[in-house]
Amino acid sequence: MPIATPYEDLLRLVLDTGTTKSDRTGTGTRSLFGHQMRYDLNAGFPLITTKKVHTKSIVYELLWFLRGDSNVRWLQEHGVTIWDEWASPTGDLGPVYGVQWRSWPTPSGAHIDQISAALDLLRRDPDSRRNIVSAWNVGEIPQMALPPCHAFFQFYVSGGRLSCQLYQRSADLFLGVPFNIASYALLTHMMAAQAGLGVGEFIWTGGDCHIYDNHVEQVTEQLSREPRPYPELVLAQRDSLFDYIYEDVVIKNYDPHPAIKAPVAV
């Protein structure tokens, strides 16, 4: 059976048809607006194989989000530096993803734990069309070190299986998107386990899908490689979504091509 390669197909599409655009960082991009990728989570864990992806950073970042944290110190303590470029001297990033997920402020001064609410809704009313988590808090964006790129996501249950669709307003295809695909696929597995559901699909929807000009050479190298079978995720059982630790996430049979380095546009 041929290996599905929606990510590599998107890279190819942007290289071939993307529009030349300027951007906030001054780097320049090839860009395409609006695209969707679908991954069957029963056909393997969608971790890109055409280059090695740093799985430790993916897992710790998701656990950091679920902690409701917005300071990089906890990440640094675990050897993860992917947020360092945007942090203040004290490590603070402002009210970014984790804060919005776990502690969205209301006008009355209360806070909403969107993740707990989403899990509760999956258990009580799996057919709800309102099961959405948003990191795009317009009133707090000026205080954020970086406005959310992966802005909001929705859960959907059919036939006892949980699917998740993410909307990503800004998609750095070479460096960022492989992380985002794996991170939300992992979150879907965790939420499904806690809700007593199987897994369905992870659906990624992108807005501005771009390849930075200084990543074109790396993307070309990546696309010259033959995709390999996706690995398998083994997730330990936990009583609570918020009890997971790094060692609970095991990715088996991950056999990627070597990593390809590229500069981050800040």
From Swiss-Prot:
Its main subcellular localisation, reduced to a broad class, is cytoplasm
| SUPFAM superfamilies documented for this protein | Thymidylate synthase/dCMP hydroxymethylase (SSF55831)
EC class name: transferase
The record ties this protein, via Gene3D superfamilies, to:
Thymidylate synthase/dCMP hydroxymethylase domain (3.30.572.10)
Pathway field of the UniProt record reads:
Pyrimidine metabolism; dTTP biosynthesis
The EC number on file is 2.1.1.45
User: GO CC annotations?
Assistant: cytosol
Catalytic reactions on record? dUMP + (6R)-5,10-methylene-5,6,7,8-tetrahydrofolate = 7,8-dihydrofolate + dTMP
Q: Pfam families from the xrefs?
A: Thymidylat_synt (PF00303)
**Signal peptide (residue range):** none
Q: Which PANTHER family match?
A: THYMIDYLATE SYNTHASE, THYMIDYLATE SYNTHASE 1
Indicate the family of this protein.
Belongs to the thymidylate synthase family. Bacterial-type ThyA subfamily.
HAMAP family xref list: Thymidy_synth_bact (MF_00008)
What does this protein's UniProt record list under function? Catalyzes the reductive methylation of 2'-deoxyuridine-5'-monophosphate (dUMP) to 2'-deoxythymidine-5'-monophosphate (dTMP) while utilizing 5,10-methylenetetrahydrofolate (mTHF) as the methyl donor and reductant in the reaction, yielding dihydrofolate (DHF) as a by-product. This enzymatic reaction provides an intracellular de novo source of dTMP, an essential precursor for DNA biosynthesis.
Q: What is this protein called?
A: Thymidylate synthase
Question: Which species is listed as the source?
Answer: Mycolicibacterium vanbaalenii (strain DSM 7251 / JCM 13017 / BCRC 16820 / KCTC 9966 / NRRL B-24157 / PYR-1)
